[in-house]
Amino acid sequence: MGSKIQVTAGNVKIGGGDKVSVQSMLNVPSTDIEGSVRQAKELEEAGCEIIRAAIPNKDAVKLIPALKEAVSVPIVADIHFDYKLALEACAAGIDKIRINPGNIGSDDRVKAVADACRQRGIPIRIGVNSGSLEKEILAKYGHPTPEALCDSALYHASLLEKFDFNDIVLSMKSSTVSTMIKAYELAAERCDYPLHLGVTEAGTERMGIIKSSAGIGALLLHGIGDTIRVSLTADPVKEVYAAHDILKALDIEKDGVQFVSCPTCGRTRIDLVKIANEVEDKLRNCKKNIKVAVMGCVVNGPGEAREADIGIAGGDGCGLVFKKGEILRKVPEDKLVDALLEEVEKL
């Protein structure tokens, strides 16, 4: 699974067969240090393993030590155009830089950033997307094709390689899922650098999760990808939940509850939608490696979910609690959730 090369950002290893890490990005203004710190803590608590922050100007560099003091996960500085901001971020203790070397000027500036990162063991992510492609590459391909995205990423990597810098992570994001998938497939064929997967500008929570699941999931199933970010026009905490859900759905991540529930049918006699949502919410932060099922009827429920460690199946104003397909007891509908949670505690 993943790349051959491994880089280290703070306490997280990326690539080289290590676990797939989950990332997100602060969306609080970088001048709001208190708000940024509060959101970073929320992301860490939700399971975010790498947090990125925009560093648009010199004042924003002050955010880095505040974040480093507040959370234990690595902090990534997102920098565009001004190489001096990258140097200042390095000096401030940043764990990783996101930058496109071709956008920061002459070779001496690229060398300065490469040297500063090498001296401190700071990896650099080259983040290419449809809007960042060079004029020459666009002229060659006509529009942001997968080949264009891959060529651009490898071009930027070559600028760092020229100065003996190889602690590189690549991303080639597109808002078109098929383009994104093909771009990463090409990169996986042409280099051994760790790959940061994501569908950029994926959209609101509903469509963004669908597009990210399709794109990120397809690549991970084929062993491509080392770290992921689900980009949503929503609370970043929801990005983290969605990313972990993708990893659980693919059986890549084993920590936490795998939750299954039936779509309901005419046999359902309980408010299964309400019950399922309540159970899922209450087990969101449970770290037990178990499968929990919420089924609509007692006719098929226990049998269909016999692989679940624990579950409930609805009846007429009541329901059954079952374990590995075997019925444990019958309880009233209003007690089903509590009964299920009690059994989860025993596991």
Model-derived features with residue positions:
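N-terminal amphipathic alpha-helix/helix-capping segment at the start of soluble metabolic enzymes
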Residues: M1-M25, R118, D281
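Active-site mouth loops of central-metabolism enzymes
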Residues: G17-G35, A54, V73-F81, I137-C150, ...
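Hydrophobic faces of well-ordered beta-strands that scaffold small-molecule active sites
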Residues: V20-L26, I51-A53, I75-I79, I97-I99, ...
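Glycine-rich, proline-tolerant flexible connector loops at the mouths of alpha/beta enzymes
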Residues: I33, E44-L67, R98-S106, I168-V177
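Alpha-helix-loop-beta-strand connector modules within alpha/beta enzyme cores
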Residues: K58-I79, A112-I124, Y184-L195, V279-D281
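Glycine-enriched alpha-helix->loop->beta-strand junction motifs that scaffold or abut catalytic
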Residues: A70-V73, A91-I97, R118-R120, A188-P194, ...
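Hydrophobic or amphipathic alpha-helical targeting/insertion segments
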Residues: K84-R125
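Catalytic alpha/beta core domains of metabolic enzymes, predominantly
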Residues: N129, I137-R284
